[in-house]
Amino acid sequence: MEIAACHRLQLSYDSPCGGLHGHNWIITVYCKAKKLNADGMVCDFKHIKNAIHGKLDHSNLNEVLGFNPTAENIARWVVQRIPQCYKCKVQESEGNVAIYTSHNNAQADEL
């Protein structure tokens, strides 16, 4: 899914990313289940989109997330937010991609 959002990064070094700037993020969510539900799905994509797109699209990520919104942290947040999600890929621009994978979503690291 595509998200239009702005952020500024809090980094330990000088970077232009410390200033407010925006991206058209592409977020890919990977879900799994031992068995499909009664509808033949792992989960409804609409529920995933509502949980992510509904919260992040056209927002200031620093304000809505409450943590340093690096692509890596956003990917981890998605994995923690969607119970069936085990991996998330966040692309903030072409060539700038972060992937977070949890081998056991229930025990994903806390932010």
Each PLM stretch: what is its role?
Residues 1-111:
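Charge-rich, low-complexity N-terminal segments
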